[in-house]
């Protein structure tokens, strides 16, 4: 099961929170489609800015969009010009004022999405894919991750038949729910077609605080008594 399913979706509520923070009974469908449009627009607009995650918070009178990015300077633009332009477009899409909050990713060399985008960009620049994968592998391990796996698939080096290659270092415990597993995906567009890049990173286990563990024990006792 852990080998097939998306590791982020499997661990929501355990090691990772939701990317859409709101509740609605009547407008659920409308809000869901708006969230999808907002994410697509932001990711297309800042395609090369290392956008890792887009968290959307909804309030009765406004919407907060928290943009986690490895390159905040590209997103902000000169004197905040990009932010103001994006705010206007999002306001017309949602009919509500939108606050755009930029959150910088501190160590992009350990974030799966940033690694995948870096590999895809270098493949598009005709760099040898094996060398690129090994470099990113070593950089991530030096950055502090406990395990990393990189998989690329497609017409590698322009071969007639598509194939896949992967490199792995450390361990990736996909079946352990408390493990902090991150997944990144990016497509490299080459003259021979698209090459898919997937990256899994493992950065330790989620450890509960003493208060949370005591609450869990108390809940178990109440159920069994």
UniProtKB/Swiss-Prot annotation:
Coiled coil: none
A single Gene Ontology CC term: cytosolic small ribosomal subunit
UniProt-recorded Gene Ontology molecular function terms: mRNA binding; rRNA binding; structural constituent of ribosome
Superkingdom of origin organism: Bacteria
Transmembrane segments: none
Start and end residues of each KH type-2 domain: 38-106
Protein keywords: Ribonucleoprotein, Ribosomal protein, RNA-binding, rRNA-binding
GO biological process terms held by the UniProt record: translation
PANTHER family: 30S/40S RIBOSOMAL PROTEIN S3, SMALL RIBOSOMAL SUBUNIT PROTEIN US3C
NCBIfam families: rpsC_bact (TIGR01009)
HAMAP family referenced in this protein's UniProt entry, alphabetically: Ribosomal_uS3_B
Family per similarity comment: Belongs to the universal ribosomal protein uS3 family.
Subunit structure: Part of the 30S ribosomal subunit. Forms a tight complex with proteins S10 and S14.
Role played: Binds the lower part of the 30S subunit head. Binds mRNA in the 70S ribosome, positioning it for translation.
Protein's recorded name: Small ribosomal subunit protein uS3
Taxonomic lineage: Bacteria, Pseudomonadati, Spirochaetota, Spirochaetia, Leptospirales
Gene field: rpsC
């Amino acid at each position: 099961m852990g080998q097939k399913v998306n590791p982020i979706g499997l661990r929501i509520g355990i090691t990772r929170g939701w990317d859409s923070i709101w509740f609605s009974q009547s407008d659920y469908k409308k809000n869901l489609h708006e969230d999808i449009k907002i994410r697509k627009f932001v990711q297309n607009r800042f395609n090369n800015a290392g956008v890792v995650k887009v968290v959307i918070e909804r309030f009765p009178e406004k919407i907060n969009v928290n943009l986690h990015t490895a390159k905040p300077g590209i997103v902000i633009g000169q004197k905040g010009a990009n932010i103001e332009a994006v705010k206007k477009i999002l306001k017309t899409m949602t009919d509500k004022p939108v606050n755009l909050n930029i959150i910088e990713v501190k160590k992009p060399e350990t974030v799966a999405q940033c690694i995948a985008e870096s590999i895809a960009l270098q493949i598009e620049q005709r760099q040898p894919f094996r060398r690129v994968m090994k470099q990113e592998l070593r950089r991530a391990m030096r950055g502090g991750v406990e395990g990393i796996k990189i998989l690329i698939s497609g017409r590698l080096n322009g071969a007639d038949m598509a194939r896949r290659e992967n490199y792995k270092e450390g361990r990736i415990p996909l079946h352990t729910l408390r493990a902090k597993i991150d997944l990144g995906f990016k497509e490299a567009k080459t003259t021979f077609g698209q090459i898919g890049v997937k990256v899994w990173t493992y950065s330790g286990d989620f450890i509960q605080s003493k208060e949370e563990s005591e609450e869990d024990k108390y809940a178990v006792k109440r159920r069994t008594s």
